[in-house]
Protein backbone atom coordinates (compact mmCIF):
# COMPACT_ATOMS: atom_id res chain seq x y z
CA UNK A 1 0.00 0.00 0.00
CA UNK A 2 1.28 3.40 -0.92
CA UNK A 3 2.12 5.49 2.12
CA UNK A 4 0.14 8.68 2.33
CA UNK A 5 2.26 11.78 2.13
CA UNK A 6 2.16 14.17 5.04
CA UNK A 7 1.73 17.87 4.48
CA UNK A 8 2.85 20.49 6.93
CA UNK A 9 4.54 23.82 6.77
CA UNK A 10 7.39 23.75 9.26
CA UNK A 11 8.23 26.80 11.26
CA UNK A 12 11.25 28.91 10.29
CA UNK A 13 14.47 28.06 12.03
CA UNK A 14 15.69 30.67 14.43
CA UNK A 15 19.41 31.15 14.02
CA UNK A 16 21.42 32.42 16.91
CA UNK A 17 23.74 35.39 16.38
CA UNK A 18 26.06 34.19 19.11
CA UNK A 19 29.56 33.12 18.15
CA UNK A 20 30.58 29.52 18.83
CA UNK A 21 32.25 29.08 22.19
CA UNK A 22 30.64 32.13 23.78
CA UNK A 23 29.05 31.15 27.09
CA UNK A 24 25.55 32.41 27.72
CA UNK A 25 23.35 31.96 30.73
CA UNK A 26 19.86 30.88 29.76
CA UNK A 27 17.13 33.35 30.67
CA UNK A 28 13.63 32.28 31.63
CA UNK A 29 12.44 33.55 28.24
CA UNK A 30 14.72 31.18 26.32
CA UNK A 31 14.89 28.16 28.63
CA UNK A 32 12.67 26.09 26.33
CA UNK A 33 12.97 24.73 22.81
CA UNK A 34 11.43 22.34 20.29
CA UNK A 35 13.50 19.88 18.24
CA UNK A 36 13.27 20.90 14.56
CA UNK A 37 14.95 17.98 12.73
CA UNK A 38 13.59 14.45 12.28
CA UNK A 39 16.28 12.86 14.48
CA UNK A 40 18.49 14.98 16.75
CA UNK A 41 21.70 13.44 18.06
CA UNK A 42 22.42 14.42 21.66
CA UNK A 43 26.10 14.30 22.63
CA UNK A 44 28.29 14.13 25.76
CA UNK A 45 29.93 17.45 24.88
CA UNK A 46 29.23 20.32 22.52
CA UNK A 47 31.21 19.01 19.55
CA UNK A 48 30.57 16.62 16.67
CA UNK A 49 33.39 14.26 17.69
CA UNK A 50 31.85 13.68 21.13
CA UNK A 51 29.99 10.44 21.91
CA UNK A 52 26.26 10.27 21.38
CA UNK A 53 24.17 9.89 24.55
CA UNK A 54 20.68 9.59 23.07
CA UNK A 55 18.42 11.03 20.40
CA UNK A 56 15.45 13.36 20.37
CA UNK A 57 12.75 13.49 17.69
CA UNK A 58 11.13 16.27 15.66
CA UNK A 59 8.56 18.16 17.70
CA UNK A 60 9.90 17.01 21.06
CA UNK A 61 9.70 19.80 23.67
CA UNK A 62 12.96 20.18 25.63
CA UNK A 63 14.38 22.39 28.38
CA UNK A 64 17.49 24.43 27.60
CA UNK A 65 20.02 24.17 30.42
CA UNK A 66 22.86 26.26 28.96
CA UNK A 67 24.36 27.61 25.75
CA UNK A 68 28.05 27.66 24.75
CA UNK A 69 27.69 27.69 20.96
CA UNK A 70 25.85 24.39 21.42
CA UNK A 71 22.75 23.91 23.58
CA UNK A 72 22.68 21.59 26.54
CA UNK A 73 19.11 20.30 26.62
CA UNK A 74 16.96 18.01 28.77
CA UNK A 75 14.28 15.77 27.24
CA UNK A 76 10.91 15.09 28.92
CA UNK A 77 12.29 11.74 30.14
CA UNK A 78 15.19 13.57 31.85
CA UNK A 79 18.01 12.64 29.46
CA UNK A 80 20.51 15.45 28.94
CA UNK A 81 22.99 16.12 26.18
CA UNK A 82 24.48 18.71 23.87
CA UNK A 83 22.98 19.56 20.47
CA UNK A 84 24.06 21.87 17.65
CA UNK A 85 22.35 25.25 17.76
CA UNK A 86 20.50 24.68 14.47
CA UNK A 87 18.59 21.53 15.51
CA UNK A 88 16.37 23.17 18.12
CA UNK A 89 14.17 26.26 18.08
CA UNK A 90 14.55 28.19 21.36
CA UNK A 91 11.40 29.92 22.61
CA UNK A 92 9.66 31.58 25.53
CA UNK A 93 7.71 29.62 28.14
CA UNK A 94 4.47 31.00 26.68
CA UNK A 95 5.28 29.80 23.15
CA UNK A 96 6.48 26.45 24.55
CA UNK A 97 3.19 25.99 26.44
CA UNK A 98 1.22 26.90 23.28
CA UNK A 99 3.16 24.24 21.34
CA UNK A 100 2.44 21.63 24.01
CA UNK A 101 -1.30 22.45 23.99
CA UNK A 102 -1.63 22.52 20.17
CA UNK A 103 -3.24 19.62 18.32
CA UNK A 104 -0.57 17.40 16.74
CA UNK A 105 -0.01 14.75 14.11
CA UNK A 106 2.25 11.88 15.18
CA UNK A 107 4.08 10.13 12.36
CA UNK A 108 3.47 6.37 12.44
CA UNK A 109 5.09 5.44 9.11
CA UNK A 110 8.71 4.30 9.29
CA UNK A 111 9.78 7.11 6.95
CA UNK A 112 8.21 9.90 4.94
CA UNK A 113 8.46 13.50 3.79
CA UNK A 114 6.83 16.85 4.42
CA UNK A 115 6.15 19.14 1.50
CA UNK A 116 5.93 22.88 0.97
CA UNK A 117 2.39 22.56 -0.46
CA UNK A 118 -0.22 19.76 -0.66
CA UNK A 119 1.23 18.34 -3.87
CA UNK A 120 3.50 15.31 -4.34
CA UNK A 121 5.62 17.31 -6.79
CA UNK A 122 6.11 20.27 -4.41
CA UNK A 123 9.47 21.02 -2.81
CA UNK A 124 10.40 18.64 0.02
CA UNK A 125 10.76 20.48 3.32
CA UNK A 126 11.99 17.66 5.55
CA UNK A 127 12.10 13.94 6.08
CA UNK A 128 10.07 12.47 8.94
CA UNK A 129 10.34 9.23 10.90
CA UNK A 130 8.08 7.33 13.26
CA UNK A 131 7.45 9.28 16.46
CA UNK A 132 7.91 12.74 14.95
CA UNK A 133 5.33 15.26 16.13
CA UNK A 134 3.98 17.96 13.84
CA UNK A 135 1.52 20.72 14.63
CA UNK A 136 -1.86 20.09 12.99
CA UNK A 137 -2.45 22.76 10.34
CA UNK A 138 -5.44 21.15 8.62
CA UNK A 139 -5.88 18.77 5.72
CA UNK A 140 -6.45 18.91 1.97
CA UNK A 141 -7.28 15.66 0.21
CA UNK A 142 -4.89 13.02 1.53
CA UNK A 143 -2.43 15.64 2.78
CA UNK A 144 -2.25 16.67 6.43
Give the label of every model feature segment.
Residues 21-31, 37, 47, 54, ...:
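Boundary regions of SH3-family modules and the immediately adjacent low-complexity/disordered segments
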Residues 1-28:
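Bacterial Sec-dependent N-terminal signal peptides
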Amino acid sequence: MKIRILFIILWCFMISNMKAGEICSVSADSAYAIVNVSVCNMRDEGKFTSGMTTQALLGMPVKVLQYTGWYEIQTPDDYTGWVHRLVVTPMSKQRYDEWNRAEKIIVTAHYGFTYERPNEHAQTVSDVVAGNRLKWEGSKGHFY
